[in-house]
């Protein structure tokens, strides 16, 4: 399902899914660094990883989406170094290839504000998943007898109905006709 996210694709998700398999058993990633060690993030690509961070796919590893998003360059570099070392069969004195590489520092920072978080999620998924920009206004909308889309559908099944709706303008496109008139 995550392969359907914008700019992610099946191949990127296949690499991540394969990284979850350890000795034939599916094991979830425990941290972002565990993900970087088990999946060659450079092969996955930065753009798919950005979209996964925006969508909340890594929320179990770190709920601060902005920190993950901003740390991707370091994580991709760390992952590339580990996988380069593994492919050259270099093993440290202390264990497997890449185990001796220090984890990059992820700077502490505030997460995106709720509106920013929803906006970033919308960019990745194409709709609001964890909330809606109008959630903060629901009490006021109910007082004004504004209906939800579900309520409108429910009433429409019973016959013609007039309803007030609220929405969010997601974008504006101003175009010009052949005569130069804007519409």
What does each model-found stretch correspond to?
Residues 1-158, 175:
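Sliding clamp-binding short linear motifs
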Residues 6, 166, 179:
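Short glycine-rich loop/turn motifs that provide flexible caps or phosphate-binding loops at active sites
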Residues 160-173:
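OB-fold and OB-like beta-barrel modules that bind single-stranded nucleic acids
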């Amino acid at each position: 399902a995550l392969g359907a996210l914008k700019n992610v694709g099946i191949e990127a998700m296949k690499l991540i899914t394969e990284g979850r398999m350890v000795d034939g058993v599916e094991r979830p990633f425990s941290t972002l660094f565990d993900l970087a060690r088990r999946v060659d993030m450079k092969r996955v690509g930065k753009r798919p990883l950005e979209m996964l961070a925006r969508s909340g796919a890594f929320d179990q590893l770190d709920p601060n989406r902005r920190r993950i998003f901003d740390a991707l360059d370091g994580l991709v570099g760390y992952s590339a170094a580990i996988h380069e070392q593994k492919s050259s069969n270099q093993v440290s004195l202390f264990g497997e290839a890449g185990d001796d590489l220090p984890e990059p520092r992820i700077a502490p920072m505030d997460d995106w504000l709720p509106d920013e978080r929803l906006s970033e999620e919308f960019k990745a998924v194409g709709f609001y998943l964890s909330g809606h920009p109008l959630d903060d206004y629901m009490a006021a909308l109910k007082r004004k007898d504004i209906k939800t889309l579900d309520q409108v559908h429910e009433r429409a099944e019973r016959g013609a109905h007039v309803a007030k709706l609220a929405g969010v303008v997601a974008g504006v496109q101003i175009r010009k006709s052949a005569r130069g008139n804007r519409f």
